[in-house]
Every structure is written in C-alpha cells, then in structure tokens.
C-alpha cells in the first residue's frame, strides 16, 4: 500500500496532505502554493486549465470557466438550490437525467467530471511532490452533505483514478488535525464556514476517540454568499447611478466577483477598501467606470443575516447534542470565511469563550484527512472516529408519510431494519421510496431512490411481512434492501444518489479522463513547439532585416521563404508538433547563411589591433 493522501475538495479552494514520518504534512502544488483554486477552464484552443491558470483567465473567459462546482454536486435540476445557482453562475447549467450538469461548447459535463479534473491536478501534483504514484485518498465532505452528494464526491475520485478509501466529514477531519483526539475528555465545537458550505459539529474527545454528538449546517451557505451580497450591492449602486444593469454582462459579472472577493479579504484587516473597476461597461455616452468605497460596517450590515443563520445552527446543534453552551470546552474555527472579524466576534460572543485558531483554517481539513489516511493504512494507532449521519433516513408509507428507519445523529456505520406490510388486499408488489430528511411528509424530504419488490404472495392487507433494511457504511453511503419474510424474495438498491451516473458511465469517464490526460500532454507539446517556432521566426526576421545587405539575393530569398513557411504553419491551428518542428528545422538550416554573414560582418568591423612593441619612427 502506497501513501494515502488526504484531500479537502473545497468549493473555492482545495488542499491536500500526507501522513509520513509520524506527522501530517501539507503538500504544495506545482505552483508552490498550499491551496489550489477549485476552478476548471476550457479555452478556445481546446486546452483544459485547472487551478491558478484557470483563475487567471476567468475575466476574459467567464462562460467557460467553472468555479463553485461543489454547489451543484448531487443536485437535482428541479431543486430550488439549482435554480439559485443558475442565477449566480455564468456558465450554463443543464438537465442530465434529472440531475444538474453543465454545458460547455455544446458538450455536457457532470459535476463529478469537473471535480475529477481538480482531483487529477491534485493527484499529479502530489505525485510530483512525493516522487511516487498516488492511487489512494481520503476525501472530505461537509457534514451536512446528503447521500447523493457523498456518492457524487466518491464518483469524482474514481473518475480521477483514485481509490477513495473513505469519505469523512470536514469537522471531524478538523478535530483530528487539531490533535483533539489526544486531549482529556472534552466537548468540542467545530465551526466550519468555507467557500460554499457551512457545518457546525459538536464532538466528544478523549482516550483517542473522536465521537460526533450532533451535526448540522447548510450545504449552500459560505463565502460565496458573502461575495454575492457585495456583488448585489455594487450592481444596485451602479444601476442607480448609470441606469445600466451590469449583472447581465457575464464578463462584467466576473470582474465584480473578483472585486467582491478581494474586498471581503481586505476588510478582514482594514476598516475600508476601494473597489475600482475602470471600463466595466459602456453605453451610447461612452465607457463607464465603477469606483466605490466599501466600509467594514457596510459589509457587516450586508451579511448580518448570513452570520446570524450560522448562530441559529449552533444553537440547534448544541441542543441536539443534549448540552448547554457552558458545557462546550473549546471552539475550533475552520474554513477561510472564519477570518471575517464579525464571524469571530459573533461566535465568541455567543459561546463566551476564546476561539481556537491555532492551525491554518484553509489547510486543517486536508491535514485531518491525511491523518485518517494514516489510520486506515495502519500508521496511526489507537484513534477511533465515531461519526454520525446528518439527516434521518426512511421510506414513504401509506398517505405519503415519511417513516424513519435511521434517525439523524446515529453513529455510523449503522444497520437497522423495520417490518412493513401491504396497504391493499392481494397486493403483488410494493414500491420502496427511499427518503432523507426531517419533514413528516414524504414530498418535503429528498428522494434518494426507488425500487420494487415483486412476487408477494396473495394475502389480505397487513398480513405480508416486508422487512426493510438500511445499511450505511463508514463513508455515509447507503444500501437499502427489502425482503418478503414469507417467500424469502428480496430486492436491494445501492443508492446511487441523484448523480444519475451508472457504473458503466463512471468507467467511461475514467477512460475519458485518461484519454484527455494524453491529449492534454500532446496539446501542451504542440503549444510549446508553436511558441518556440514563433520566437525563432520573430528573431530570424529581425536579424534578416538588419543584415540583408550582407547576403546575396538568393540566400536572402531562401531565408525569407523559410520564415514565411514557418509563420504560415504557426497560424494553422491544425498544425501538428511534427509539422512545426520540420518547418522550424528548415528555417534553422536556411538561417545558417545569415549567421555566417553576421559573423563575417562582425569580424570585418573589428578594429585592427596595434602591436605595442612597434614604434612608429624613422631609423637612421
């Protein structure tokens, strides 16, 4: 078993770490950074950019630059959250088998495929850093991710060529990273406010056991939402001043997004910042510029309800854990958005305790995941994680009621069964609708899947005994089975979530990812060959223009023809690496005569050296 890497696949940024030499270490990417932007871009030349390179070109290529893909991971297209995401994101969200996907230049990609490209970049960078192949990983997800979102995350890892040993909750991972498993028995609260999600988890630690008592949160609340408040404010102010609706312009919207994110970061240390976006748009009267001062007080008023929503979640989770605020020993702050001063102030004020900020909030989750990797590999001894299911699981029963089989807060892995019966006389089959959520009516909860149990023996209603079993593994992924206890007939469904991906589709995506990897490498070679050719053509043309007088006409024409041929090849987008190299080689050979002419000219211009021993004088 090789090294297992821990990956925090974030909404805004991702990070990775490895456990070696009895300690967890953050792995820097090829750019030397400890975090990688969770951004994928498709260029007009067919390149796929990931991370910093994708982020740098976002303003000029907004419709083909994919960020915050985690926000639609595992979402059904008709869900309200999908509609909200569609309004906010510049790229096109489409319906694929009922699930959210995106469309780029007429091609449809699932969130799993986009996430896989981020994971492939992390995998390759980890291999470069470690000097060995990486095939296994522990990937973290928000504690409040439902079954569909967890399954989709695991599928992304598979497509990227990773064997995902475990999906673990981010707050639990953070608790491991802080070394809380080594402390005396304490009640710990982890407050995790990331780029797109919010989790709050209460854990009990002690004797090398980390046990989750309760968890809650919002899979659609994070730093992006703080940015969006600033974007809305700036757009409204701009419209009031100019009458122009700037949010309809995707390029302007991307510039607004970057400016809002930067302003948010600056206001963590400054009381005021200026947003200056020249030439943001134009109308009949000419170009328009956006210049606006934003104070920390204004930013706090724009985002106050978001912060209060997190405080409300804290209250609920502490109550679910059967505790009071006073029983919380320590508060651990995780996620980049916890740097916002008002967030720290409100959490500290509510719990009435100093906050633990001893580890980088952007890296702590990946570090914890690597420790869990060490546990699974056997390098870390005597650490036990007892996580819980964030939402109740059950089935739809007579009258459209949600009947719970596994309650939220149940320690996983878990397996529970309940016996149900038929609703009508001589009913030959039952449909099992699997649900996740806390609402009393089935329609108000999330449907995870449906299957039928056929061949029930004729009997009056209420007589057949149908045993339904829910089995959740350590990743929080669910399998449901139903058995007619009279006939022994059974049916099982492994919940694939709303990702809509079959095993064969995932396998195809794995192969496609490998294929693209080779294609990308070939495209990079062509680009490098084109760049080299362009540089040579430019330099040779410049030298030819300067030294043409020192060449005979035939040689000069031969060199010019070789330059023109190379330039034509460079302009041809379909030119292969071999064609570019052949034309480059031809120019190098033709230009040898130019080099000789330049050398001869230099020699001719060298001043004749006088012999110091010779005296110019008459001799008698």
Swiss-Prot record:
Cited SUPFAM superfamilies: Actin-like ATPase domain, Heat shock protein 70kD (HSP70), C-terminal subdomain, Heat shock protein 70kD (HSP70), peptide-binding domain
Keyword ATP-binding attributed: yes
Keyword ATP-binding (UniProt): yes
Cross-referenced InterPro entries: ATPase_NBD, Chaperone_DnaK, Heat_shock_70_CS, HSP70_C_sf, HSP70_peptide-bd_sf, Hsp_70_fam
Induction of its expression: By stress conditions e.g. heat shock.
Region (Disordered): 597-620
UniProt GO molecular function: ATP binding; ATP-dependent protein folding chaperone; unfolded protein binding
Role played: Acts as a chaperone.
Family in the record: Belongs to the heat shock protein 70 family.
Record protein name field: Chaperone protein DnaK
Organism per entry: Helicobacter acinonychis (strain Sheeba)
Gene: dnaK
